Amino acid sequence: VVLTGITDYDRFISIARAAMENSRITAVSLRMAAMLEVFHELGMLPKELLPGAGNVVAYVERKGSGSVDLEKDYDRWERNYVNQLCDKGSEPVFDVDLSRQQSRYVMVINAPDDVLELAFVRPIDGSIFVFSSSEPHNEEQEIDRQRVENWLRILGMRSVQVHASGHASRSELIEILREASPKKLIPIHSEKPSVFNELIKEAGVECKIIETPRLSELRL
C-alpha cells in the first residue's frame, strides 16, 4: 500500500512503473482514476497507465451503509464513471478482490483517512505501507501521521518512509545538527523556522537560533 498525493502524477508514474516491474497491478480510487484521465488528456500521463490498459485498475471504496450499493451510496459522477469503465471493458475491483489477491496489486491511497479502507482489505501480517510524501511539518500533520501509524499497528503492517524532494528529512537534520554542533543557526528557506528549537533539543546541542539575523549577529 502506498500513500501519496492525488495530484502528484510524477510520483504516481514512478509507483505504477515499479509495480509493473514487479508484475503487479496498481489499484487506485475512483477519484484518482478520474484524475489520471485528466492527466492523460493534458499529455502528462502515458496511455499505458490509464485504467483499462492492463496496468492500472480502479477500486470502489465502501461508502454510506458500508455495502457496495452504487445506486444508494455513491454520487452520480461515480456511478457514471463506473459505467464508463465497464463499457470500456475495465471493470473496477472491490476490497474483496484486493484481499483475495494481495500479491497481485499495489494499492494507492491519497489521504490519511483512506487508511480505514484497509480494514476491509485485511492486509497480510507484515505487509508494507509506504509513506510516499514529505514528513510531517506541523502539529496537524503529526497527529495525522500518528493516527495512521496506530491503524497500521492494529492491521499488523509495517511502515516505510520513501520521499525524495531534495530536502533533508527530520532525522537527517537532527543528525546534521549533532555532527556540526553549531553555535548559531540561521534557518533559510523554511516555512516553520521555530521547529528548529525542537530539532536542537533532540540533537542535544546548545545553539542559538537567529530567525531574522542582523549583521552584528552574524559575527562569530
Q: What name fits each language-model region?
A:
Residues 1-220:
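Acidic/His-rich, metal-assisted hydrolase cores and their charged scaffolds
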